[in-house]
């Protein structure tokens, strides 16, 4: 066996850990590219009305897609722990059963989402001017919801199967497909929001369907392969419970985004929604680094927890906290320096909107100092198969604290209260995360 191949059972130095998590980090960044690229081309080639419509309906679509993220992250923790006990046959069965369950969830989501799309768009504040674009974009994405969910599912399991580089290759290919098709369909052919939606779903097919062929091939060196699954409601329930924090994070993000949009429509109008859309795109990419790191670490943590290797758990925890602190400072500094060019890139055609976006981004950037610790803390407890604590952190961070901040801070700080809302939520969540990590350190032996 090559000395360069990194296995879950290894001892991880800082360099080895960074090498292992590099692929999932880049995977998450490229996944975030979908909405960012759509937003860039729609804003610059279809105008701010279409751009505002996309940002208004996206939280609704994201709420359905997060089911794949839930089963992927929660299921990968369960499968990695099973591998840690040495039961390869059961790991394959669980992996296959969870994949089939995600496909069924995707089909059901498409049906439900189709009927709820128009009332949801109206509830989210879509005006008669925005509604047609909301419906057109939403219907195209809903038809391919299963591929979207499977893409999230496979991101976690490529890491667990010790094939993060292959997962990265699929994600990069899907991301490049989206970029090229957006350029052709929106930039060259002026296909507007229909072209952007078409580019997105084709790229999701690449990332969500392509990996199936790999895992059906039992001759490759993956730790996991598809087999004829035996359904287990208990295992599916455990995977969903493990991934409930990720479900809560994504559902809450969708609900909170909708609340942001409603507040901004009331305080500023469509320009506020457009500015918030830019913040979300920048936030997607920056948070993708932390989410990718947490996803990359999770199977390692689950494996060593299953193997009762407490020394390695302590090693992983210490190194992670240090690297997250360094990354947070670097991202904050980058966001401050890049606020003007980023605002210009998305909305440079409107001077007033560009200035609003630049100001908002500089305030919003303070959240990058803190969010990495909270994302990791939630994922850490998921990896330890403690879905309850993980979900509690996510629920407070992404819903309770943010809803409070979005509703209350504008009363004190006016529009700046909207831009500071996430900073407040991350600071409050950090206190909760630190307390829970301290309380459970002897139970799980990571510190």
Where do the model's predicted regions map?
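Short alpha-helical transmembrane segments in multi-pass integral membrane proteins
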Residues: 1-21, 79-144, 188-244, 301-367, ...
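Transmembrane alpha-helix boundary and packing residues in multipass membrane permease domains
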Residues: 24, 28, 40, 77, ...
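Hydrophobic transmembrane alpha-helices of multi-pass small-molecule transporters
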Residues: 63-66, 110, 178-183, 208-212, ...
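Helix-terminus/linker motif at the lipid-water interface of multi-pass membrane proteins
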Residues: 33-52, 121-128, 184-191, 251-285, ...
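Transmembrane helical elements of multi-pass membrane transporters/channels
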Residues: 19-38, 140, 174, 203-207, ...
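Short runs within selected transmembrane alpha-helices of multi-pass transporters and secretion channels
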Residues: 140-159, 170-178, 196-211, 291-294, ...
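N-terminal transmembrane alpha-helices
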Residues: 9-46, 59-74, 78, 103-110, ...
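Small-residue-rich hydrophobic transmembrane alpha-helices
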Residues: 51-111, 148-167, 275-333, 337-339, ...
């Amino acid at each position: 066996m090559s000395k360069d191949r990194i296995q879950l059972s290894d001892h991880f130095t800082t360099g080895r850990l960074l090498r292992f998590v590099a692929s999932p980090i880049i995977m998450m960044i490229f996944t975030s590219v979908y909405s960012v690229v759509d937003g860039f081309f729609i804003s610059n080639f279809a105008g701010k009305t279409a751009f505002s419509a996309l940002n208004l309906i996206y939280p609704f679509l994201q709420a359905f897609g997060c089911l794949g993220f839930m089963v992927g992250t929660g299921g990968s923790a369960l499968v990695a722990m099973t591998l840690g006990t040495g039961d390869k046959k059961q790991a394959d069965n669980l992996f296959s059963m969870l994949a089939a369950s995600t496909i069924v969830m995707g089909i059901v989501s498409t049906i439900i989402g189709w009927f709820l799309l128009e009332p949801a768009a109206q509830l989210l504040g879509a005006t008669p001017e925005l509604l047609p674009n909301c419906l057109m974009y939403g219907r195209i994405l809903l038809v391919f919801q299963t591929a979207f969910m499977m893409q999230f599912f496979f991101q976690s399991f490529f890491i667990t199967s010790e094939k993060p580089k292959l997962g990265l290759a699929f994600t990069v290919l899907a991301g490049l497909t989206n970029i090229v098709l957006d350029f052709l369909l929106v930039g060259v052919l002026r296909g507007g929001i229909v072209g952007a939606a078409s580019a997105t779903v084709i790229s999701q097919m690449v990332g969500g369907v392509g990996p199936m062929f790999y895992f059906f091939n039992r001759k490759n060196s993956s730790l996991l392969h598809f087999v004829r699954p035996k359904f287990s409601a208990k295992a599916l329930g455990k995977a969903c419970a493990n991934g409930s924090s990720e479900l809560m994070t994504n559902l809450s993000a969708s609900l909170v985004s909708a609340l942001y949009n409603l507040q901004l429509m009331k305080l500023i109008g469509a320009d506020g929604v457009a500015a918030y859309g830019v913040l979300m795109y920048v936030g997607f990419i920056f948070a993708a680094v932390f989410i990718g790191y947490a996803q990359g670490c999770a199977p390692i943590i689950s494996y060593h927890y299953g193997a009762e290797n407490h020394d390695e758990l302590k090693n992983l925890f210490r190194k992670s906290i240090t690297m997250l602190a360094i990354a947070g400072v670097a991202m904050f500094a980058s966001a401050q320096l890049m606020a003007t060019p980023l605002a210009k890139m998305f909305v440079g055609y409107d001077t007033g909107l560009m200035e609003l976006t630049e100001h908002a981004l500089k305030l919003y950037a303070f959240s990058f100092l803190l969010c990495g610790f909270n994302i990791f803390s939630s994922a850490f407890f998921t990896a330890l198969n403690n879905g309850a604590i993980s979900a509690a952190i996510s629920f407070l961070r992404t819903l309770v604290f943010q809803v409070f901040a979005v509703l209350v801070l504008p009363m004190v700080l006016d529009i700046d209260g909207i831009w500071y809302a996430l900073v407040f939520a991350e600071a409050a969540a950090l206190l909760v995360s630190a307390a829970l990590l301290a309380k459970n350190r002897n139970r799980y032996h990571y510190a």
